[in-house]
């Protein structure tokens, strides 16, 4: 916080998802995965935003169970909470979630993002320039998100080239 960092993203549910292929989460695994949130809130309260990364590892019902358990922690967003193969399920999740949905770095074109936007499930549009078709396609996706009055959060886990391109996109897109 003293260095100006006001947000962090964590993914403590992955271990539990790997145990069941995302089909269930035990009470013990849920408790263990919530521990980092408890520690963060105890240490800094609400002075830092906490984003939750789900890596698209969960089926709908356990994801909804996790979302409800996260309610007391006022998380900033839930990123790819379920597999992106059912936008209907994502819409159901979004309706029950205490946090907006950030989706989805895994989508590969403006047409996939259009389908996502039309559901109303996404609160934040997360695109990855290296996976969505490059900078030109990302700019078109950002423009669509702007039409829906949604912010864009570029995703990058590949390195400096995509980071630089994402920075250029962020400076160009008003959202």
Which functions belong to the PLM regions below?
Residues 68, 74-77, 85-175:
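Shared catalytic-loop signature of beta/alpha-barrel
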């Amino acid at each position: 916080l003293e260095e100006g960092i006001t947000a962090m993203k964590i993914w403590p549910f992955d271990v539990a998802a790997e145990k069941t292929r995302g089909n269930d989460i035990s009470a013990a695994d849920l408790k263990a995965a919530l521990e980092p949130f408890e520690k963060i809130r105890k240490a800094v309260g609400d002075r830092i935003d906490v984003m939750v990364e789900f890596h698209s590892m969960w089926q709908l019902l356990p994801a909804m169970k996790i979302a409800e358990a996260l309610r007391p922690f006022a998380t900033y967003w839930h990123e790819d909470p379920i597999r992106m193969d059912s936008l209907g399920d994502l819409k159901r999740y979004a309706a029950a979630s205490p946090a907006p949905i950030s989706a989805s770095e895994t989508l590969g074109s403006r047409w996939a993002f259009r389908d996502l936007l039309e559901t109303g499930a996404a609160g934040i549009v997360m695109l990855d320039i290296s996976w969505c078709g490059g900078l030109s396609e990302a700019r078109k996706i950002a423009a669509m998100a702007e039409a829906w009055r949604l912010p864009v959060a570029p995703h990058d886990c590949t390195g400096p080239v995509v980071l630089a391109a994402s920075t250029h996109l962020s400076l160009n897109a008003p959202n």
